Amino acid sequence: DLLETLQARLERAGFSTGRARPFASWNPGWIWTAVAGAGIWAAAALYALDLFPHRAVLCLWGGFLALAVSLVLLMVAPLLAKQGLALVAAIIFPCLALRGAGFRAKTTLWRYWSCALVSMLGALFVVATLSGTELLVKLQEFRGVKLAHVIPIALVVYTLARPLRDWLNKDVPIRYLIIAALVGLAGVFYVLRTGNFGLPVMNLEVQAREFLENLLFVRPRTKELLLGHPALYFAMRSRQPHKSWWLPVAVIGQISLVNTFTHIHTFLSVSLLRTLYGLLFGYVLGWLAVKAFDWGKR
């Protein structure tokens, strides 16, 4: 009775029923994964050059060596090679997005969307490397979720803190230590919330998610909507975006953007719509927050 009732409900909803058949095996040729790998390691070398401009030869040779290792691994253990390349892309492109030429744009809008486009390029590389039947049906999946959420933040903080090394030899007020402790606790909470088996979601957040899904069909990700993208707006409207301390928060949105496309079993159109909603509404929330702050100062 249960199966008959379920079948009737599915048919009323517009679904057709029939005999279950296995998916045909499909995998792109290794050459396409190799091309994607070359692009990923080129981006990694470019970011390394930005971090260490006086180590140009080392950065370039490191990129070539990493690509060679990836090609060998692609022949020996193709799934591991794909997962490794996708992880590198998920780490590098959010960082690269916040170090790009878009900062030289004159308007906040162009700066904002330039960063998003670099991250979308990273998402494209993730999709290219994670293609294949076993990944599409989730028999295998993206590995390194927590690394992809932590390493970009650490790299962005490193780039901002490098000019401040002299502070290590100075007396630090207690209030700064308290702020650092609170930031550390927030970081622990952030890491524990990542992945499929993190901290449980609060009931209020569940209700908010359901409301957005009913309203928009696909809800934007919370980290992008309420945290990352508004922070990106704040950073991009500053006089020196590349030095803004909003960037460690802004990169969370770029990480989440790329991470959306690691869920390769999800329809690409759904991931694109979700990303667009997050970028649009995040920008609007950032703009509204600035206007509210300016109004409050008056």
Regions found by a protein language model. Give the residues of each.
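N-terminal membrane-entry
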Residues: 28-40
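Alpha-helical transmembrane segments of integral membrane proteins
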Residues: 38-298
